[in-house]
Amino acid sequence: MAMASLYRRSLPSPPAIDFSSAEGKLIFNEALQKGTMEGFFRLISYFQTQSEPAYCGLASLSVVLNALSIDPGRKWKGPWRWFDESMLDCCEPLEVVKEKGISFGKVVCLAHCSGAKVEAFRTSQSTIDDFRKFVVKCTSSENCHMISTYHRGVFKQTGTGHFSPIGGYNAERDMALILDVARFKYPPHWVPLKLLWEAMDSIDQSTGKRRGFMLISRPHREPGLLYTLSCKDESWIEIAKYLKEDVPRLVSSQHVDSVEKIISVVFKSLPSNFNQFIRWVAEIRITEDSNQNLSAEEKSRLKLKQLVLKEVHETELFKHINKFLSTVGYEDSLTYAAAKACCQGAEILSGSPSKEFCCRETCVKCIKGPDDSEGTVVTGVVVRDGNEQKVDLLVPSTQTECECGPEATYPAGNDVFTALLLALPPQTWSGIKDQALMHEMKQLISMASLPTLLQEEVLHLRRQLQLLKRCQENKEEDDLAAPAY
């Protein structure tokens, strides 16, 4: 039987007051005069409707991240880097969110993973007076925004748990403005703050924990430039377990007498699909949408990526890893890696799963930047359902000296493996029985020995690794704090 269709819902008023009503406008004007609508204009500029009935958490976070001008570091569609619900999948698969919705802890995890600074509180960890102070703080600033998760029933609305940004506050009336992302259902509306607290102070049946609110602001550092961890592939749980449990056990239980032996033990037991877990961040663009030259912005980002890559190559750990991999006949193919990246790029640009694509051919070429500097571009011909699309992949490279002269080197398994080992917590190596070797290994991965840009890259990976570890252990609902480095 076909489901009956619905066109919006009537907003129960009271207790809510429609933002666009005469009274709603008056409340807005009063709050504007008092300075507690400062965050509203940023939020309303990026306000969106959730694209799926259960995407309220993803839509709310997307609105806030874009309002804060946080760069996602990867493209959404065409040439544009932009947060969209479809990109918020590092802590919970989109298929699961689409079917079941998302919990408070998982949205907090997503905000951390997306590079934001987050302070999150359940009502059991705060008071209504503290909540009111936080609302005033966020609504009085353009640099901090709040997302609330609450039960609709308290407002006599249909539905249960919901997420939405808080867009303003009227102190005289003690009312908060909810920018409801389910705009197909209810418009933005004012509610008494005490009632909002009551709606948050309810139990989420899926977790058994109280709901709450989070304050989101720009980070002190931007997300990673060259590397990122991903849980899009189901194998990430196996890989995270290997890194967290198996590596410390392997290096403590087996006889290791050199750094190369440690690398050998870790590498030879590494799950074969580890490259689905840690990836280099590729710059993708549709060929026909771009000219043949690098833009100033593309050149700037590529230059930073190349600097990070150069710093990885200059670490002592990379030299050990490169030496070991050369003895086992490990080889990397730029065209193979690029073909995979082109398929993933086509997935992002089209919104279709990458398994529906195949890369028929690739072509490596050099193109000019604004100041005649060169960049490497791999053009891939991606095929889906018989239709072809050309995708450009901008590849960072560094120059290395060999017997025949300067040679370009690109992101490959050796530097990715180096970044992964640098991201592991220092205590990973504490079980090495040879004290001198343990000290040497800890020196190799010490943050103090790394240049500033690479330090930030490694800190980003460590942060992601800790967040994914929380998800793997189902602790994201218990631990809402930012990861400790």
Swiss-Prot record:
Q: Give induction info.
A: Induced by copper, and by cadmium during the early stages of plant development. Gradual decrease of cadmium induction as plants continue to grow, and by 15 day after germination, total loss of induction.
Q: Which UniProt keywords apply?
A: Acyltransferase, Cadmium, Copper, Metal-binding, Transferase, Zinc
Q: Which GO terms describe its cellular component?
A: cytosol; plastid
Which PROSITE patterns does the record match to this protein?
A: PCS
The phenotype of cells or organisms lacking this gene is:
Plants are highly sensitive to Cd (20- to 40-fold) and AsO(4)(3-) ions, sensitive (eightfold) to Ag ions, slightly sensitive (twofold) to Cu and Hg ions, and insensitive to Zn, SeO(3)(2-) and Ni ions.
Q: Which InterPro entries match?
A: Papain-like_cys_pep_sf, PCS-like, PCS_N, PCS_N_sf, Phytochelatin_synthase_C
The outcome of changing residue 59 to V is: In cad1-4; loss of function
Question: Which reaction(s) are listed as its catalytic activity?
Answer: [Glu(-Cys)](n)-Gly + glutathione + H(+) = [Glu(-Cys)](n+1)-Gly + glycine
What is the activity regulation entry? Answer: Requires cadmium for activity. Also activated in vitro or in heterologous system by Ag(+), Hg(+), Zn(2+), Cu(2+), Fe(2+) or Fe(3+) ions, but not by Co(2+) or Ni(2+) ions.
EC class (word): transferase
From its record, what is one biological process in GO terms? response to cadmium ion
Return the EC number: 2.3.2.15
The entry's note on the tissues where this protein occurs is:
Expressed in roots and shoots.
Molecular function terms from GO: ABC-type phytochelatin transporter activity; ATPase-coupled arsenite transmembrane transporter activity; cadmium ion binding; copper ion binding; glutathione gamma-glutamylcysteinyltransferase activity
Q: Which residues form the Peptidase C83 domain?
A: 1-221
A Pfam family in this protein? Phytochelatin_C
Q: What is the effect of changing residue 91 to Y?
A: In cad1-1; loss of function
What positions constitute the catalytic site? 56, 162, 180
Function recorded in the entry = Involved in the synthesis of phytochelatins (PC) and homophytochelatins (hPC), the heavy-metal-binding peptides of plants. Also involved in glutathione-conjugates degradation.
User: What is stated as this protein's family in its record?
Assistant: Belongs to the phytochelatin synthase family.
Q: What is known of its domains?
A: The intermediate part (284-372) is important for enzyme stabilization.
Q: What more does the entry say?
A: Homoglutathione (hGSH) is a good acceptor, but a poor donor, of gamma-glutamylcysteine units.
Under what name is this protein listed?
Answer: Glutathione gamma-glutamylcysteinyltransferase 1
Q: Which organism is it from?
A: Arabidopsis thaliana
Lineage start: Eukaryota, Viridiplantae, Streptophyta, Embryophyta, Tracheophyta
**What gene does this protein come from?**
PCS1
